[in-house]
Design a protein with these regions (language model features):
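Short glycine-aspartate micro-motif
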Residues: 2-8, 57-61, 100-105, 125
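Conserved phosphate-binding catalytic cores of ATP/NTP-utilizing and phosphoryl-transfer enzymes
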Residues: 70-104, 109-119
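Adenine-nucleotide phosphate-binding core of ATP-dependent small-molecule kinases
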Residues: 174-219
């Protein structure tokens, strides 16, 4: 059965997925120093692990910041470039049964796309994402490896790092519960444990991306 392959060539990671007819095959992510090397490495590995032949591929659809470096057909298969905002919005919309959604792309940085039945609109973005987590962790925790940062963060307690409304008031304020963040890292000090700091970094980035997404939904 003909296969269509989608590849997102990001700044640090290349993501790949395929559809065999209406059936979606398992996605894969590959890291590499070179975006072009990452593309071809991911493509070949994906075919191998899914028992696909090159001639099975009827189309390769590429997007992401690294797609600009691809100037010819991938392995001589029909290759098409797709706008990243369109790809993200369409993919997010596909995964939900809602008629109107805000799709948040959390990558190295993050951006927001509004999608309805009749419209797709890029709403903007923020400079927070995986790059922030890895960068701050490299400076503070001496590791930028996300596979080390995430397990460490799960052992931590963000309540020991963030200042919350409950730390400032005995009763909840109008529209603000006591567990709402008043200040990310507002309680951190030189004695804070690495696992708590890791939890604070991850929480700060994800919380603020989601808050920005909520604000974007009101535009």
């Amino acid at each position: 059965m003909p296969v269509k392959i989608g590849i997102d060539i990001g700044s640090s990671t290349t993501k790949i997925v395929a559809f065999e007819g209406e059936h979606m095959l398992p996605p894969m992510a590959v890291k590499a120093d070179s975006q072009v090397a990452s593309l071809y490495g991911a493509f070949g590995r994906y075919l191998y692990e899914n028992n696909l032949q090159l001639l099975d591929v009827e189309g390769v659809y590429i997007t992401g910041v690294g797609s600009k470096y691809v100037e010819k057909a991938v392995y001589d298969r029909p290759t098409y470039k797709v706008d990243e905002f369109v790809a993200t919005g369409t993919g997010g919309y596909y995964l939900t049964d809602k008629k109107e959604v805000i799709v948040i792309s959390m990558g190295t940085g993050s951006f927001f796309v509004k999608v309805t039945e009749n419209e797709m609109k890029h709403l903007g973005g923020v400079g927070l994402g995986g790059g922030t987590i890895c960068g701050l962790s490299s400076i503070i925790l001496n590791t930028g490896d996300i596979h080390e940062i995430v397990p460490l963060s799960r052992k931590g307690d963000v309540a020991k790092i963030d200042l919350r409304i409950g730390d400032l008031a005995k009763e909840k304020l109008p529209g603000l519960n006591l567990d709402v963040t008043a200040s990310n890292f507002g309680k951190a000090d030189a004695q804070s444990k690495p696992e708590d700091i890791a939890a604070g970094i991850v929480h700060m980035v994800i919380e603020n991306i989601c808050q920005a997404g909520i604000l974007a939904s009101r535009i």
